[in-house]
Amino acid sequence: MNKAIEEKEASSNTYPFGKGGFKIDKLTEETEKRYLRKEEFELIKNSPQENFILERARRLFLFSYYCFGMSFVDVAHLTQGNIKLLESGEYIVYKRSKTQNSKAAKPIKIPITDTIKDLLDWFKQNTPLTGDYLLPVVTKKYFGEQLYDHIRTRYKRINNDLKKLGRILGIKNLTTYVSRHTMAMMLQGQEVPREIISQVMGHTDLATTNTYLDSFETNVTDKVAQLL
């Protein structure tokens, strides 16, 4: 994108990660960070939908969760080129779009478990995939500003689909971002060290992870207080 701006093929005013630009994580700022209780997540996991649109949204949610809470924009950009055969097996390897230009950013390596492979196979067999994209988020061969606008539209649409799914299952405000929050809290609940959680989330420093997880603590203590 920087090169495109330099060559005047794109405008710096709409640079996706610059001031005033496209920030998919904040397209629709959530007033409250939400994560699912274990039983709510299990309900989503075990509730396949006959409606294809809702089933696609459900599986995208699960894919994000099992890929260490991968953000929607990174899910959207995954291609065959992100699948790498390493010594210990196949991995999805990528850098977060949000921090890829940071010197501290490192590639995230996600082992392709049987669950992830099953999800990828389902998308390949049941949805039209564009070009080399792994998932049915980007549906047209767009580039530059058109691509970011397209992802913005798809982000809103899939979140609407998830909210419909949530209403069916009795889960409020289900969105793609909830999968990331849920993954982080599930790991913390299993006493995974925050250093590891920080690494799999692609945070460039532990302070970001601490702030991120600490933001949930009030919600947790509030719920505990209601039990007394």
Stretch-by-stretch model annotation:
Residues 27, 35, 98-100, 201-226:
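Catalytic-site neighborhood detector that most strongly recognizes the C-terminal catalytic loop/helix
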